[in-house]
Amino acid sequence: MANYSSNVSVIGAGSWGTAIVSILSRNIDLFWWVRREGQINQIKKKQRNTRYLPNCLLNTDKIKLSTDLDKALRSSDFIIIATPSDYLCDLFDKRAKLLSNKTIISAVKGVITKSNLTPQKYFLNLNSSISYGVISGPCHAEEVAMNKKSYLTLSINDQRTSKFLTNIFSTNDIRIKISNDVTGTELSAILKNVYALITGVSHGLGYGDNFLAVLITACAKELEKVLFSLDRKERSISQSAYLGDLLVTCYSSHSRNRRFGAYIGAGYSIDSTKSVMNMVAEGYNATYCLYHMLKENNFIINAPIIKSSYNILYMDSDPSKEIENLSNLIS
């Protein structure tokens, strides 16, 4: 029986949470919070999360599975959170004290819709004693499951914590890049989903690789401008946490945000797309939140791609007309 003394809990059992558990359990014992008892029983029986990442074999001897969130938070000093952004309030609003002096590593890639807060702002508002960091791509859960060479970006300002997390995340297939740009890394992980969605819309409309290359180049330029408007820090987006994550999310067939957009471009309604995918595409809600963030600081005029995405998703604007308008702006 494993000794669960590694002091790490993972919260969330979707594709990304499962991939993170798969990586960590190669190196340490850990605690894994899963919402439903039935899902826990299935994971123990099959050694796989058959609902979200069925090809990923899990070493369940090294994983303590539980539906008890309070226990998961009390058991560990390092809490890795991999849930959809809109679940955060339900999970943590009433558990602020349990997070005191914990290190939170967010793998969340969206904005909390009802408050328009990023995960970083939400957690630090909830409990100021938290040490906060971000784990991001470029990395798809599906390729982790296939043991393909992948790179993760770890952004945190504490050197000792950074070294510990680098050690437990590093495997033969997973390499870690270190950053101290916590805010920028998180914002970029949110923004790239919006840009992947609009790329998907273009693909669904029948645009080819030639156009998509120009569109994604324009997305990269806009991402850099928007990052600076939201967090006034000079940064080069040529690093993998920014440009690399944007590229893989816009181009990959694994990208749920690209798939979401492709359905919209092909003529599906929002509701039909959600029903067909049966997965959370963070770019949908993030488009709404980012549009209003940028509108508040009078920057939306400098973000025509985000504005077009908002018009398509929330103003019932014709996708073909919006992409045609964008094509004239970026040419």
State what each model feature region is.
Residues 1-57, 62-67:
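NAD(P)+-binding Rossmann beta1-loop-alpha1 motif at the extreme N-terminus of oxidoreductases
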Residues 14, 18, 37, 66, ...:
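Electropositive phosphate-/nucleotide-binding environments in soluble metabolic enzymes
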Residues 58-60, 66-74, 78-148, 165:
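Rossmann-like NAD(P)(H) cofactor-binding subdomain of soluble oxidoreductases
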Residues 111-209:
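Rossmann-fold dinucleotide-binding core
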Residues 149-154, 183-228, 239-259:
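Active-site-proximal catalytic alpha-helix in oxidoreductases
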Residues 199-200, 228-331:
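NAD(P)-dependent Rossmann-like dehydrogenase/reductase catalytic/cofactor-binding core
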